[in-house]
Amino acid sequence: MIIVIQLIRVIRSTFIGSAICSVSPVDINRQPEGKGLYPIFAIMSHYCICNARYTLNPKSLSMYVRARSNIRKGEEISVQYLSALSGNFKRRRKIRDEWYFDCECRRCSDPTECGSYVSALKCDSCSSGNVLPIDSLEYNSKWKCTT
């Protein structure tokens, strides 16, 4: 059974995760309206701080990719696979579970998440500091207060 699960992951990662992108457009009530396959979109890399964004037209199922910042010639085009509102741990775990890689981008590498402190907890001991992971790329990292 374990071999079957591993085989499914390899197939999913190879053919769905990188060769084909399956996206579900939603209607005004956020209900899925179907699926679309976007093979060119699928070659774009993920970065939590990306240089492009995508939108879907739910009526035509057309996908549009637009630059969020200036993209220099030869620079990789990247999009976010998940919401930027999720904290590092949740986002990285979902990326690992769904796309089978560990994101190590600038935001994921920074315990403060580029100053957003999305994952930070208020310190119970001092009430003025934030508790953050010591190593945000380590899933089992210890956390400590910033003060």
Which residues fall in each region the model found?
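Catalytic cores of histone-lysine modification enzymes
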Residues: M1-L61, L85, E98, E104
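C-terminal SET catalytic tail plus cysteine-rich post-SET Zn-binding segment of SAM-dependent SET-domain
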Residues: Y47-T147
